[in-house]
Design a protein with these regions (language model features):
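Long hydrophobic segments that form regular secondary structure
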Residues: 268-277, 282-288, 296
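Divalent metal-coordination and catalytic microenvironments
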Residues: 9, 26, 31, 56, ...
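Active-site microenvironment of metallo-dependent hydrolases
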Residues: 1-24, 28-34, 38-39, 44-45, ...
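His/Asp/Glu-enriched, well-ordered alpha-helical/loop segment
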Residues: 248-255, 297-387, 400-401
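Alpha-helical scaffold segments that flank or form the walls of functional sites
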Residues: 76-144, 170-186, 435-443
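Active-site gating loops and adjacent loop-to-helix segments of metal-dependent hydrolytic enzymes
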Residues: 74-106, 150-168, 228-255, 275-278, ...
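Metal-coordinating catalytic core of metallo-dependent amide/deamination hydrolases
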Residues: 134-269
Length: 457
């Protein structure tokens, strides 16, 4: 079995003691970490087939992106002035409902490339409609780890006909997807049931998905308390807000992740804490869309598990988890008038070990420890904006680093990116195909691309 040694870097372990090891090394066998320690000790003990020189670099556990939509990546930059519901109804949903299998593959592959180049080694992604298989194939080919599922809805007052499903048929199809994809790619992919939202799904559909999740012991991924109008519509229909409604249908729990959680009530926060239901915090997209700012520092104080997320490039416009850390810290501190609302250390935890906890994966990823999966990133510290380092490394990683500073990425023990060169997908080919496909998609689906300023061909 191949052994890999990453040596000579500063290892930010994110273990329980939060050890940072200068001139550290990580030994890997197969897809697991064998040992972590000082380079001289690890190199003496382990003679590995492949050695990676991490001199001048930080070695971190890969980022865990707790909420993403890969198949929306080709929507980047559209609908900038729309509120969420307008963007959904006029752009995102028509786009998702009209994609061909090839377009879904390329869009998801493009997102995977961006995630990996930004240091994300695991994502929790919700892929739409009948093309979910193609998105899962792209995830497999990219080499990223993923909690992945098919986004489904059935209420005609919530989503267009192209995205509406028959509940009974949808449950059968999801069971097929579970059998095909849960544990696929040598265990890198785990399936989750993904009701799009409480508002957009009938009780019949939600109950059926809850039964599937219990039967196969898999996770749940949805949006909750994201937008005021759907929340009020759900209250009128059921008498319950999102989290309470999900809880009444047994869709909460340690393996349940709810994106956004902007309007979570005190009672819902208590439910999330007691059931260990997690919140996926994507700070930039809701603020950018004028949707609101989740009270994440309060949720954390309430004992709710929270992980960091980028959401979709189709709304956020990028998948840079470094930026999400910075925005999260800035807006939580700014809105609470408290510079300690989210500490710098906590922000790095949200992107790594806390993200793993939010997805119930902290027994295998999220920190660099012996026995865990070998998911690591190398960040080049030899940059003006990261100098001087000293003992300010954690501060620099959160407030100064960019996605472009990620030099190499290891996922499941495999070197997926080396010195910014992706070793799985053909990056230039995917970028070319994405550009060619994008214009045709918009024309076919009647989605208007309005430039901000006069555009002269």
């Amino acid at each position: 079995m191949n052994q890999l040694l990453v040596r000579g870097g500063t290892v930010v372990t994110m273990d329980k003691e939060r050890r940072i090891i200068k001139d550290g090394a990580v030994a890997v066998q197969g897809n697991k970490i064998l040992a972590v320690g000082r380079t001289e000790d690890i190199a003496r003990q382990y003679h590995c087939d492949t050695v990676i020189d991490a001199n001048g670099m930080a070695i971190l556990p890969g980022f865990v992106n707790t909420h993403h939509h890969g198949n929306q990546t080709l929507l980047r930059g559209l609908g900038e002035r729309f509120h969420l519901m307008d963007r959904l109804t006029k752009i995102i949903w028509p786009f998702e409902g009209g994609l061909t299998p090839q377009e879904a593959y390329v869009s998801t592959a493009l997102g995977c490339i961006e995630l990996i180049k930004a240091g994300v080694t695991c994502c929790n992604t919700m892929e739409a409609g009948d093309n979910a298989n193609e998105s899962f194939k792209a995830i497999t080919d990219a080499g990223i780890r993923a909690e992945a599922g098919q986004a489904i809805s059935d209420r005609p007052d919530a989503v267009p006909e192209s995205l509406q499903v028959n509940p009974e048929h949808a449950i059968r199809e999801n069971e097929k997807l579970i059998k095909s994809w849960n544990g696929a790619a040598d265990g890198r992919i785990r399936y989750r049931v993904c009701p799009r939202s409480a508002f957009s799904c009938s009780e019949e559909l939600l109950s059926g998905l809850a039964q599937l999740a219990r039967r196969y012991d898999i996770g749940v991924h949805s949006h909750a308390d994201e937008d005021w109008a759907p929340l009020q519509a759900l209250l009128k229909r059921t008498g319950l807000p999102d989290i309470e409604y999900f809880h009444s249908l047994e869709l909460t729990g340690r393996k349940s992740t709810m994106a956004h959680c902007i309007f979570v009530s005190d009672k819902e926060a208590k439910i999330m804490h007691e059931t260990r239901t997690s919140a996926a915090y994507a700070p930039l997209n809701p603020a950018k869309s004028g949707n609101g700012i989740a009270r994440i520092s309060w949720l954390i104080k309430c004992g709710v598990p929270v992980g960091l997320a980028s959401d979709t490039a189709g709304s956020n416009t990028n998948l840079d988890m470094f930026e999400e850390m910075r925005v999260a810290g800035a807006i939580q501190r700014g809105t609470t008038l408290d510079p300690t609302a989210l500490s710098t250390e906590k922000l790095l935890e949200l992107g790594t070990i806390d993200g793993a906890k939010a997805l119930a994966l902290d027994d295998s990823i999220g920190s660099i420890e012996a026995g865990k999966k070998a998911d690591m990133i190398l960040i080049d510290l030899r940059k003006p904006h990261l100098t001087p380092v000293g003992k300010r490394l954690v501060s620099h990683l959160v407030w100064s680093a960019y996605a472009s500073d990620v030099d190499s990425v290891i996922i499941d023990g495999k070197l997926v990116m080396e010195h910014r060169h992706l070793k799985t997908l053909d990056e230039s080919d995917i970028v070319d195909r994405a550009n060619k496909l994008s214009e045709g998609i918009l024309k076919r689906l009647g989605i208007e691309e309005k430039p901000v300023w006069p555009w002269i061909e």
